[in-house]
Amino acid sequence: MNRRQFFPVLAAPLAGAFPRIVRAAKSKDRVIVIGSGVMGASIAYHLATRGAEVTLIEKDAPASGTTRNSFAWINANNKTPYSYYALNYEGILGWRRLQLEIGPSLQIQWGGGIAWCGPDPQQIDKLHYTTSLHQPWGYPIRNITRDDLERLVPGVHAGDFGAGWHSTIDGTLDPVAATLALVQAGIRAGVTLTKANVATIDFKGDRATGVTTDKGPFFADHVVIAAGNDSTRLGAQAGIPVPLRTSKGILAHSKPMPPLVHQVLMPAGLDIKQNPDGRIVAGSNFGDTGALAPTPELGAHLLERVTGVLPETRGIELDTMTLGFRVMPRDEYPIMGRGRQYRNVHVAAMHSGMTSAPAIGQLFAIEVLDGIETAQLQDFRPQRFYA
């Protein structure tokens, strides 16, 4: 579906089963959630299932910003300290829960993640560090041999194999399709999706009263900022510091191909996955791509490297290139919760929101509606950035 058609479609009645509301919010709290990427969509959904009256405000279309350009590897790899690892791990489990709640419209591939490298000692040490770090925390990851790799990924060309690991709990999804499924589930629960550009958050005394947009004012008891890289501007209005730094990511997307791979594959310097629609997605090890441009030439090069790893993709054709700007906090850790001045304004900004969105949605429903500060988010409060 064209994302530009999404708003009118969502305006139509949506039928289907909906998960039981566990505990209603008191006095039908009115909550505005700004931003309908995966983070905002999850928060809105979880608030609505608690009985809140939720308005989800999006300036463009759901999943049209950072979410659209995400590689969408669901994992808790190389996340330290333990509290950050645990938040991501809760996110993995949360996606499995959401599949049960939402149903088949939320497609996730649970094939695990596999990384390997050549004989370079530094790369080998890095891979072994990953397993040695996470196994004591209970993460289902293990070192693998070349034979293991070739058994797990039939037809793979391993090259000069030095070391590898296999994480069985990891998954991946199409970020746009998954976010739309969350938005639709939220609407079934009572979320109102509104296309508008938020200019200001409005205040009276020590509380936010709503927002002013290009479509007029909206009133609420709580405001949640989940606006991706625009969270810095909006947070500043509420006195909440949300320092983000630029981190770009380029991905090559192929035209649809027959099903070939169900894992996330990470040979040295390359990331490979296949979406449910058959498109191969390739990037370069999740780092900031700097001054690189998303040119067709770069896309062709990435897909050529894919064929070097998966010979069955011979003949693969480039469809599109995407350039994304990650929501990367200055210290690389999530920025979660309310500020000091206005206790009913909350912010949610992090990388990777794709993994942790289900957990954040569940935790924010508690924090916003019950006024409880959850233990899982204590290490990630905005207060650490106050002067």
Residue ranges and their predicted role:
Residues 71-152, 269-271, 291, 305-310:
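Dinucleotide-binding Rossmann-like beta1-alpha1 core, especially the glycine-rich loop
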Residues 49-67:
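Glycine-rich FAD pyrophosphate-binding loop
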Residues 2-24:
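N-terminal export signals
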Residues 315-387:
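C-terminal catalytic lobe of FAD-dependent flavoproteins
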Residues 31-55:
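N-terminal Rossmann-like FAD-binding beta1-loop-alpha1 element of flavoenzymes
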Residues 45-49, 74, 97, 104-109, ...:
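Active-site substrate-recognition segment that forms the wall
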Residues 93, 97, 118-189, 194-195, ...:
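Flavin (FAD/FMN) cofactor-binding and adjacent substrate-gating region
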Residues 34, 218-228:
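Short hydrophobic core segments
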